[in-house]
Each structure stands twice: as C-alpha cells, then as structure tokens.
Amino acid sequence: MDYTVLDNSALFSGIPTKELCNDLNTVPHHIQRYDKGETIFHLMENASRIGIVLEGNVQAQKPFPNGSQINVSVRKAGELIGAAAAFSRSQKYPCDVVALESATIMFFLREDILLLLQKDLRIMKNFISELATASFMLQQRLELLSYNGIAQKAAFYLLIQARQSGKNVIKIPGSVSNWAMIMNVSRSSLHRELKKLEADGLIAYAPPVIEIHDFDALQNVLSK
C-alpha cells in the first residue's frame, strides 16, 4: 500500500512516511472498501475494531425506535472511527457508521492499535489528542442540536467556528447540503434561513464561504 495517503492523518502527524511504514508493517491491519450507503459499524455491535478513513466520507448516525435519526458526525479521509467506543467500558458502538460515498477504511483490532501506540510515543500522543478532540466536538454537537430553530443552529455553528479560527469568514463544511446534514435539517430550509440572516445584515452568504458582519446580532439569534 502507498502509505503517503496517511500523511494528512492527525493520528500520524509528525511521523515521516518511512518510519510510519515500518511501524505499520509490524502491526496487523487490513483494508476494506465500502459502497455508498453500506454500514461499517452497527449500533451496539461489539467495538473490537478501530478504523482510519483512507478515502471517502462516512457518517455516524443515531437511529431511534420511532424511525427518526440524528446525524452525529461526519468523518473524512485521515480521521478515526470507532476509537472511543473500542476503549469505552461498554465496548459497544453507540451509533451506526455508514459510508456517504464509496469509502476505504484501514482497520486495526483493539489489541493491535495498542501495540502500535506502544511502538511510537508520538502516535500515542496523537491518539490521546484525537480522543480528546472528539469528546470536545461531541459536546459542541450536543449543544448545537439543543437549539430548535434552524437559524439558531446556523448562528451557533458560525460563532463557534469564528471563535476557534479567529476569523469572520467561515468556510462551509463541504457544501450547503453537507452542512444541512450535519445539523440534521433540510438543505432548502437551511438555505432559506441563511438568506434571511443575510437580508437582515448579519452575514454575507456566498458559498462556499459565509462572512459574519454582525457578531452581536448573530449572538442574539441564539436567545430568540
């Protein structure tokens, strides 16, 4: 395999390709392809595997008995899937993970990822950082989903991104359709609310970016 595809993975940040290749060649793993819509991990399945997305985008989805579903997160190439579940007390996947398009995943068994972490302290530090980041992002995700209005969800997302980046120009995550999916709303409804925010002078809506014009007014949207 061409391991250069992992150069952009946060898990292997700071590790030269040659060293990474040597590490991976001594630890069992396998690579599997999935078609669009195919399930990678099933809800409450034994979390014995950890994956790294090599190609494509995958989504964690939380289904409910009444037929509704929450789109929890999207993972793209270079990102981990299943890591927190594999090392949790329950060792069960809390969501379905589904391929949004053709996807390729590198899998490690839980015991084998531990071997990899022991081999290279840099990978261990990166792994801990990834778990902490995922936990922080989940907290933000839960807060976003706590808002009922679409304008509130959009305002919260834009303000969080602006605070983290220190910029007032925010890049839309992938596309408006993808952004809508992340926020669990329809594309048309999100587009309509963004146009309203633009008409009110709060933002400039010009996909693939949005420029925030009035931070205070956008903050006030959250309390409506």
Residue ranges and their predicted role:
Residues 26-27, 45-47:
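Short, small/polar residue-rich loop motifs at catalytic or cofactor-binding pockets
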Residues 58-71:
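A short beta-strand-loop-beta hairpin characteristic of the jelly-roll/cupin
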Residues 161-224:
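Phosphate-/nucleic-acid-contacting segments
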